[in-house]
Amino acid sequence: LPPMLYAIIASGGGVVSVSIEEMFKAGLLPGLLLVGMTAWWGIRQGPKLGEAGRQPFVWAEAKAALWGAKWELLVPVVALGSLFGGFATPVEAAALTAAYTLVVVSVLHRDLRSLRDLWRVISECGLLMGGVLLILGVALGFTHYLVDAEIPDLAVAWATSTIHSKWLFLLGLNLVLLVVGGLVEIYAAIVVMVPLIVPLGEAFGLSPLHLGIIFLANMELGFLAPPVGLNLLLASYRFKKPMSEVTRVSLPMLAVMVIGVLLITYVPWLTTWLPSVWP
């Protein structure tokens, strides 16, 4: 769902030949589909897991929580409003969002009380971005090697001579991307894999928008895929549960998401309809 970071990296970094705005529009309906399916499953299974620790829903508490988070809830409004409003480029929208966040944190919430606090936050962000840029740089170098070695052309020639059905190609693509999502860091996967699958998809008549959303949906699926899905490891650490238990209880949710990814894959208008009617 917008504003999704990985779509920004894929399109803003030139990995996919579509704009950030188009990726946001293409990802809206698939994102709502996955959210709706997982929410339905959680609501359906909640009562079956027992009532221990469950609290009744109180509208007054919900309103109070929403009011307390009002400034934070406006962050995506600032980002998307400035971008889709037409008065900011993606880079300018990012800068405007960062400035708005800084004002909220330092002036309204007063979490940053001095220049020392601000420098600490900037240093932490710099370390994070440095790691991401290092991964992207190495992955981009590997991608250039693949292009120079004509690996995408060889892959297209092999696929078109071996696979004669678009639907079979999509099934194989999902299986490959599921493995990649469970084993490869997503930033590197975007830079290395997307330039390979886009020519393959175009050879089978698939649009880059559709392929980009299929890729991102499978990466999210890979986060839940045992045995090394990142979200499984984080959940095991956060809730202090053994990895085997976290994996076991996540399998039904994984199955629900697999159905959602297959719908996104085989019903292309979920990704292409909104960009076509929203210029």
Residue ranges and their predicted role:
Residues 1-279:
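Alpha-helical transmembrane segments of multi-pass membrane transport proteins
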